[in-house]
């Protein structure tokens, strides 16, 4: 079988988004179809389960440094309001709730939110899940920590999305985001390898031209008075079959942004 993949085939040209919105309906439909698979560590969400401990560690440690907490404490985030935007079925909401945070998880997919509520109920966790979008939230709500993990490459308007996120951040708060860099290496590894060769992800999960470079992300933050204070790449090693944090941000990467000045 001949495999042909072109970056232009992974284009957002056919985006089903209306002007002035962050919502891409095609993206919502794509992830809604996976709603029953979010919590299966061996299913289509397996890659997310593999990197989830690294995401949790990166955000927890940054938050503990920011808010002067002991990262070894089981309740290290007690008293902090955390908003997880594009929460899916709650893979980050649940561990952060266990760390003591008051967690609000939002997702535009009703089926994702239903799966999240059901799993939280079975785990006896109290999490405020809402089927909504960032632009439909009340901007008067304020949060100590806002997460946008593996989300910005799926929204229709990255600038508008981050503007709305920043508007809900408390003074002295922090925002964490993760996405994929945009270059030929990320196309080769993030799309060709992950979706076509290794088949870690369903084909069409990502669109290469919607990946966001660290410089682009930094400019969006700067426009909102935020600066990147921490950053890390997330890399896979076939030797040992494991993911780890790295200074290599060519493909997957995470950042923390805080108010500057």
Curated annotation (Swiss-Prot):
- Look up keyword GTP-binding and say if it applies: no
User: Is-annotated flag, keyword Transcription?
Assistant: no
Q: What are the start and end residues of every segment in region (Disordered)?
A: 1-22
Q: Which cysteines are joined by disulfide bonds?
A: none
Q: Which domain of life is it from?
A: Bacteria
| Catalysed transformations (reactions) | a 3-demethylubiquinol + S-adenosyl-L-methionine = a ubiquinol + S-adenosyl-L-homocysteine + H(+); a 3-(all-trans-polyprenyl)benzene-1,2-diol + S-adenosyl-L-methionine = a 2-methoxy-6-(all-trans-polyprenyl)phenol + S-adenosyl-L-homocysteine + H(+)
Enzyme class, broadest EC rank: transferase
Which GO MF term does the entry hold, naming one?
Answer: 3-demethylubiquinol 3-O-methyltransferase activity
Q: In which pathway does it act?
A: Cofactor biosynthesis; ubiquinone biosynthesis
| Binding-site list for S-adenosyl-L-methionine | 55, 86, 107, 149
Which E.C. number(s) belong to this protein? 2.1.1.222, 2.1.1.64
Pfam families in the record: Methyltransf_23
Keywords, comma-separated and alphabetical: Methyltransferase, S-adenosyl-L-methionine, Transferase, Ubiquinone biosynthesis
What is one Gene Ontology biological process annotated in the Swiss-Prot or TrEMBL record?
Answer: methylation
Q: Where is the composition biased (Low complexity)?
A: 8-18
* Family named by the database record: Belongs to the methyltransferase superfamily. UbiG/COQ3 family.
Instruction: Summarize the protein's role.
Output: O-methyltransferase that catalyzes the 2 O-methylation steps in the ubiquinone biosynthetic pathway.
**PANTHER family associated with the record:** METHYLTRANSFERASE, UBIQUINONE BIOSYNTHESIS O-METHYLTRANSFERASE, MITOCHONDRIAL
Please report the name of this protein according to its UniProt entry.
Ubiquinone biosynthesis O-methyltransferase
**What gene is it encoded by?**
ubiG
């Amino acid at each position: 079988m001949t495999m042909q993949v072109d970056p232009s085939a992974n284009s957002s040209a056919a985006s089903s988004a209306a002007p002035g919105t962050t919502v891409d309906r095609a993206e919502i439909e794509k992830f809604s179809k996976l709603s029953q698979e979010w919590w299966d560590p061996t299913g289509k969400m397996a890659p997310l389960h593999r990197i989830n401990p690294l995401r949790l560690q990166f955000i927890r440690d940054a938050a503990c440094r920011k808010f002067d907490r002991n990262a070894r404490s089981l309740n290290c985030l007690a008293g902090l309001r955390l908003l997880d935007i594009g929460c899916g079925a709650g893979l980050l909401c649940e561990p952060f709730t266990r760390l003591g945070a008051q967690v609000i998880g939002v997702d535009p997919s009703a089926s994702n939110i239903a799966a999240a509520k059901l799993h939280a109920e079975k785990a006896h966790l109290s999490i405020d899940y809402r089927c909504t979008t960032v632009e439909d939230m009340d901007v008067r709500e304020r949060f100590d920590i806002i997460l946008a993990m593996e989300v910005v490459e799926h929204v229709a308007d990255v600038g508008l999305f981050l503007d709305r996120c920043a508007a809900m951040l408390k003074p002295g708060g922090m925002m964490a985001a993760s996405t994929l860099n945009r270059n030929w290496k990320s196309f080769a590894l993030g799309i060709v390898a992950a979706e076509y060769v290794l088949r870690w992800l369903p084909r069409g999960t990502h669109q290469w031209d919607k990946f966001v470079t660290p410089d682009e992300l930094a400019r969006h933050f700067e426009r909102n008075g935020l600066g990147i204070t921490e950053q890390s790449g997330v890399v896979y090693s076939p030797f040992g079959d494991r993911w780890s944090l790295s200074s290599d941000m060519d493909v997957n990467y995470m950042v923390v942004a805080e108010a500057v000045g």
